Amino acid sequence: AACQLGTAASFARDKQDYPAVRSDGRQDSKDSTLDRIAKRCSEGGDFCSKNSECCDKKCQDEGEGRGVCLIVPQNVILLH
């Protein structure tokens, strides 16, 4: 049983390391951009500044050069 548990834990850990790659080798559509896969942008809820870019391009200024990336729901059109 311990051996099976270790295998399950190992599988779960491996799956977490590569969440954007499906078992058939294709990228998951929700993480289809290179920026998200390479984590070159900040996700919603992460801190941001004028020197860092949010994946959804929405950094809410919190003052003193700090901000928070807004969480933008999918399938919602933002008006500027």
Swiss-Prot record:
Expressed by the venom duct. Keywords: Cleavage on pair of basic residues, Disulfide bond, Ion channel impairing toxin, Knottin, Neurotoxin, Secreted, Signal, Toxin. Disulfide bonds join 41-55, 48-59, 54-69. The keyword Disulfide bond applies. One of its GO terms (molecular function) is ion channel regulator activity. The keyword Disulfide bond applies. Its main location: secreted. Residues 1-8 form the signal peptide. GO terms for cellular component: extracellular region. Residues 9-40 form a propeptide. It is found in: Secreted. The presence of a 'disulfide through disulfide knot' structurally defines this protein as a knottin. Belongs to the conotoxin O1 superfamily. This is Conotoxin Bu14. It comes from Conus bullatus (Bubble cone).
